[in-house]
């Protein structure tokens, strides 16, 4: 099927609204993507006609809800090309998935004198859990520095590994710079040193196909709400032998096999031992609808359209005086910028007056802001429903702001 942005836009009700008297130009999908009618409808239909608590229920609605939930687990496994549905853990989002690994695998496998490697471009969700783990156990956190263009200093990376390196935690695509990291080479290097690899895929899964078996990563995590799905649901992929060896990090219902006041508790097998309590079943149903939606459009076709739009945007933005762009020429999803010495909040507020939604601030990447010696940046993100006309409006808006503010 040929990709049609007009057909895609027709599936997203919010794109019909106006903001401040102007048609909405939503350029903030990297923070959270809008939802197609298919996702909204699937979740609403579940709550209207199919809701019940999953697991252990013998009545029809419970059995149906359980089957639908487990079907989405298989669907997510297929989406990532995982080896089995039992390698998919439902989590609240990328942040919870990383914390799960840090608190379960990390507590058991990282000790005093060991080290973990991250990069300078990471989202706080892929920094803070490892800082907390290192503080708990007396390990060292090592950081891959960046080049001025926002790519990794790859020549430094081999020297960061040693026999005490336990984990490389790395983003696939930077949420600020759009840098796409060379995962295959990094994963191979980590494995040569006996280290495991966790990939933060939050900014990647909506932009291109992901194959965790081809990558060879040990853990991969993403959030549904950035993939046109609901909030409060995400996926943690973990290699089966790792998940089965990991202890649960939360206790409660569903994650147990047996509970005894005298003999203690035994755990369910993975992935269910990591899903304590009543799950976000509606969110899981919505996630399944989102996976179906993007799969039917074709991630390869989506990627081709978005890359064409990105090239158009980077060229068009050259017409804005005093615009400072951050990040490499080859990027995915996002364009971070500042306009002269004007604060990002001021620029973002003016753009909002023109009906253009961008993100402003440190983007949960304060170390990256420190690297560029700025308190904040504006970030325009491009999704499959954005258009060249919206890019033109962004350019015109920035030109107008420059003229007004000088």
UniProtKB/Swiss-Prot annotation:
Its main location: cytoplasm. It catalyses: (sulfur carrier)-H + L-cysteine = (sulfur carrier)-SH + L-alanine; L-selenocysteine + AH2 = hydrogenselenide + L-alanine + A + H(+). One of its GO terms (cellular component) is cytoplasm. Disulfide bonds: none annotated. It is found in: Cytoplasm. Its EC number is 2.8.1.7, 4.4.1.16. It comes from the Bacteria. The active site is at residue 364. One of its GO terms (biological process) is cysteine metabolic process. Pathway: Cofactor biosynthesis; iron-sulfur cluster biosynthesis. The keyword Lyase applies. One of its GO terms (molecular function) is cysteine desulfurase activity. PANTHER family: CYSTEINE DESULFURASE (PTHR43586:SF25). Homodimer. Interacts with SufE and the SufBCD complex composed of SufB, SufC and SufD. The interaction with SufE is required to mediate the direct transfer of the sulfur atom from the S-sulfanylcysteine. NCBIfam families: PRK09295.1, sufS. Belongs to the class-V pyridoxal-phosphate-dependent aminotransferase family. Csd subfamily. This is Cysteine desulfurase. The gene is sufS.
């Amino acid at each position: 099927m040929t990709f049609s942005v007009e057909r895609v836009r027709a599936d997203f009700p919010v794109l019909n609204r106006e903001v401040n008297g102007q048609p909405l130009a939503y350029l903030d999908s990297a923070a959270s993507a809008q939802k197609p009618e298919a996702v909204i409808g699937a979740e609403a239909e579940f709550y209207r006609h199919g809701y019940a608590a999953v697991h252990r229920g013998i009545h029809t609605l419970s059995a149906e809800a359980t089957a639908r939930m487990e079907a989405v687990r298989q669907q997510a496994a297929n989406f990532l090309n995982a080896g089995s549905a039992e390698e998919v853990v439902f989590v609240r989002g990328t942040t919870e998935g990383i914390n799960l690994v840090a608190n379960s695998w990390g507590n058991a496998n990282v000790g005093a004198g060991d080290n973990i490697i991250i990069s300078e471009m990471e989202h706080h969700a892929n920094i803070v859990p490892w800082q907390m783990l290192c503080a708990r156990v007396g390990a060292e956190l090592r950081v891959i520095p960046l080049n001025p263009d926002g790519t990794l200093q790859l020549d430094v990376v081999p020297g960061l590994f040693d026999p005490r390196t336990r984990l490389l935690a790395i983003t696939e695509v930077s949420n600020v710079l759009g840098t796409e990291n060379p995962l295959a080479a990094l994963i191979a290097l980590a494995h040569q040193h006996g280290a495991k690899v966790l990939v933060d895929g939050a900014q990647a899964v909506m932009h291109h196909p992901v194959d965790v078996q081809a990558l060879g990563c040990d853990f991969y995590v993403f959030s549904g709400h950035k993939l046109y799905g609901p909030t409060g649901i995400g996926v943690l992929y973990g290699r089966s032998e790792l998940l089965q060896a990991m202890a649960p990090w939360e206790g409660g219902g569903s994650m147990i096999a047996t509970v005894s006041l005298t003999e203690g508790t035994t755990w369910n097998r993975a992935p269910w031992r990591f899903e304590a309590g009543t799950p976000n079943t509606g969110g899981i149903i919505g996630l399944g609808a989102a996976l179906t939606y993007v799969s039917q459009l074709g991630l390869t076709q989506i990627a081709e359209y978005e890359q064409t739009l990105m090239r158009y945007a980077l060229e068009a933005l050259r017409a804005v005086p005093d615009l400072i762009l951050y990040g490499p020429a080859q990027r995915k999803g996002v364009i971070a910028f500042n306009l002269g010495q004007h604060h990002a909040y001021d620029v973002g507020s003016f753009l909002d007056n023109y009906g253009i939604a961008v993100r402003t601030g440190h983007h949960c990447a304060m170390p990256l802001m420190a690297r560029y010696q700025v308190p904040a940046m504006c970030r325009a993100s491009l999704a499959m429903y954005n258009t060249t006309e919206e890019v033109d409006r962004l350019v015109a808006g920035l030109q107008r702001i420059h003229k007004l503010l000088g």
